[in-house]
Amino acid sequence: MEPEFPLEFLVSGTPISQQASSQSRTAWKNVIRAASTHALPEGHWLTEEPISITIFYFPAEPMAGDIDNIIKPILDSLTAHIYFDDRQVERLLVQRFEPEGIFSFDDPSPKLSEAIAGNKPSLYIRLSTDPFEELR
């Protein structure tokens, strides 16, 4: 059974950097995969569709590192878990929302609302098979 898109889920914890140890990266990838299982049907197939990914990071305190350093471990955790290959990713949006400056979303999904109101640090991850949906 193929996953139903869009697919949204939350990940608790501070993202690790691509420069972290192999052991830390593996542990973080397992955390992301475990968090995603609640949004996936049991025994799901990998999609072959083009993928759009939105990653919003809600840190507990101002982020010390660069936002671009957290992307690769997240994408690696989704490869061969939700989609076959990271070449399928046609669009990627990554943004952090510092604790003192939460943006007021016009119409957040229930899962995004949960991320905004929930415990920090956390990630909101959304996958879609329509890379052009926000351009319409």
Q: Where are the language model's segments positioned?
A:
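Acidic, proline/glycine-enriched N-terminal capping motif
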Residues: 1-136
